[in-house]
Swiss-Prot record:
This is Uncharacterized transcriptional regulatory protein YvfU. It holds the Pfam family GerE. It comes from Bacillus subtilis (strain 168). Residues 133-198 form the HTH luxR-type domain. GO terms for biological process: phosphorelay signal transduction system; regulation of DNA-templated transcription. It is found in: Cytoplasm. GO terms for cellular component: cytoplasm.
Amino acid sequence: MIRLFIAEDQRMLLGALGSLLDLEEDMTVIGQALNGEEALHAILKLEPDVCIMDIEMPVRSGLNVAEELMKKGCVSKVIILTTFARPGYFERAVKAGAHGYLLKDGEIDDLADAIRKCVKGKRVFSPELTFNMMRDENPLTVREQEILRLAALGKTTKDITLELYLSQGTVRNYISEIIQKLNAKNRTEAASIAEEKGWI
């Protein structure tokens, strides 16, 4: 019997998912949570075979929970189930050791099949996301990524020069190049584009 844990902040969807998966002969739902913090503590205590998690949840996101579980050496396999087909989220989920990343508009049978595959050690990802990852190659150099990451944190040009030991002119040139490469209006928009695509 595959032991499942579901974390989803929409109560109705949480209940529906639990009921539908409980109908599968080889699955049982052993726990549920409406936020990421509850999910983290319960998963560490219950050690389910598979955790199905939304990304956008109160207190902690599903991605944050997945990262914490990996740090703590938890053996439960994580499947991210979300409405967000963003390569940035997908890449972060893969780095956090997620065994699956599926979109909520899929069929319950597809989710059940994905759960069975994950238990066998396979990884299951939404085709839309794998296509996006192949299509969108990061155009930024390592240094440009570093500078844009700092800019995304709200650092000024002066802050960046002090942190990276570069002149203000050099940093301005890098930022100008980044904005041009990403076809953005300013550094804020450039950071937003890069974050969404998983480039920084």
